[in-house]
Design a protein with these regions (language model features):
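Conserved beta-strand signature within the Rossmann-like core of class I S-adenosyl-L-methionine
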Residues: 228-236
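Conserved SAM-binding loop of SAM-dependent methyltransferases across substrates and taxa
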Residues: 107-124
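Conserved AdoMet
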Residues: 2-101, 219, 235
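Extended basic-aromatic, gly/pro-enriched interface segments that bind polyanionic ligands
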Residues: 126-202, 206-214, 240
């Protein structure tokens, strides 16, 4: 029987491989309690039985758990820095075929933005971006490549006009030439192996939800995944302290 939040964390780890101990407890517990109430369950035990036996409800749980906030060209000033300083420097040091990893890529907005920015500097055939997330639903959406107009609100027109096809009044579909630049795969930052010899790792606005110990462990693994002289690109509110 799942009696309390401690039992619930153990149950979720066994069922999904997601370790809730790595997330800030007050924040995560509040989100989970809200989800349980929304699904009209009386407590942890009832909800655990439901997600164990209902694949759709389990998918909803994982999707809700892995906080997905993403849009194209989010925080334009940072993208400008990437475009004008970081990428040219990496290309100068390592050549045009950079190994890039978009970690916790959500619905694909970030790796596709990377591909479009990089396409101004190197041939499309030389662009290969490895993109991972723990959530199957967002990965499927990323592979589909269809986005709302709101997701593209910060994207410069030069990219929108060149790489998107409008679908009705509200949606846009990304071009196949950009889709081919990105390889999506399911991966858990807390337990799965990391790609090695990366020139650039992008992981933005994700680790703010993790405990300090979990963040430290992930940053160490990121460091081990980078080549000497490589770059870790994080969100504008995130700090890495040695």
């Amino acid at each position: 029987m799942v009696k309390d939040y401690e039992d619930f964390k153990k149950f979720v780890l066994g069922l999904t491989g997601i370790d809730l101990n790595a997330y800030k407890e007050k924040q995560m517990k509040r989100r989970i309690d809200t989800l349980i109430a929304r699904n009209k369950h009386t407590g942890y035990d009832s909800y655990c039985n439901a997600i164990k036996n209902d694949a759709q409800m389990l998918d909803e749980f994982v999707n809700y758990l892995t906080i997905n906030v993403s849009e194209f060209y989010r925080n334009p000033a940072l993208w400008k820095k990437l475009d004008e300083i970081i990428l040219p420097d990496l290309i100068k040091k390592f050549g045009p075929r950079l190994k890039i990893w978009s970690a916790a890529c959500s619905t694909g907005d970030e790796p596709y933005s990377l591909a479009m920015v990089l396409a101004k500097k190197v041939p499309l055939k030389d662009i290969k971006i490895y993109a991972t997330d723990i959530d199957d639903q967002v990965l499927e959406k990323a592979k589909d490549g269809v986005y709302s107009a709101n997701s593209l609100k910060g994207l410069p027109d030069e990219y929108k006009n060149k790489y998107f096809e409008k679908m009705g009044d509200k949606y846009y579909k990304i071009s196949d030439e950009i889709k081919k630049c990105v390889e999506f795969k399911k991966s858990n930052l807390l337990k799965d192996s990391y790609p090695q010899s990366c020139h650039l790792i992008v992981c933005r606005n994700v680790l703010i939800y993790f405990t300090e110990d979990a963040k430290l462990e992930i940053y160490k693994k990121f460091n081990d995944s980078l080549v000497k002289g490589g770059c870790l690109f994080v969100g504008n509110t995130e700090q890495i302290i040695n």
